Amino acid sequence: MDFGVVVSSSWNVKEVTECARVADEAELDFLLMTDHYMTPRSNESIDAWTVLAALATQTERIRLGTCVTPIPFRPPQMLAKIIATVDQLSNGRAVLGVGAGWHQAEFDAYSKWEEDKIRVAKTHEGINLITRLWTSKEPFDFKGRFYCAKGAILEPKPVQKPHPSLWFGTTGPYMLRLAQRYADGWVPPVPGVSAEVYETVLAKLRKPGGRRIKLSFNGTLNELIETIPKFADLGFDGAILARESPQETPQAIKELATEIIPSYR
């Protein structure tokens, strides 16, 4: 089982950097950062991918990604370039968390809010364009319903081959169908989900003979202590420390590393 931690883009740079340092030293497998410019709880935020680029130069082994990036929020060509750069800086440790977005206020302020089915369709098309930029060796033209590119080429390529992992963070039926096709992993929303949602995800993304998709669950330190055996038996293979305060998270990481992880590696 892999172990990770999620930090919030509403925390300050010092808090996030300290969590990343401790997580890297504790040999956690990944650190994920929420990717919001505004939330219902706070209008304070730092840009996730800018911070992850900085963390890439300050860590050695831990994978770095988002939980999750709303694909329709930014131009996909620019997002592809940003993540490829983080993958270069980290020597192949970038992870793209994939979502369609949910908080209308931040889209209204920074992007463009559209109905659910349009955001899902833009996510689908955006992922196609992003992965093509990551893998195409020659310039290409792209003309989709929402995005267009002429003579597009991305260099240098990401270090990871064929490209950085895509970890979907969604519970809706349409996005789960996309996850069936594209996902390398699935992560739950930070607030957590019900047992019924976990059962649905397991049924949709772990079909016999289907692609192997890493499935994760999350919780506070105490919640993980209680639930890891159950989720491991169900076939989940990623545990994410979440919902701890920025002040408590470094110590929780240390306790996770010393008291829990050795039993599952």
What is the predicted role of each segment?
Residues 1-265:
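Active-site-adjacent structural elements that line small-molecule/cofactor binding pockets in enzymes
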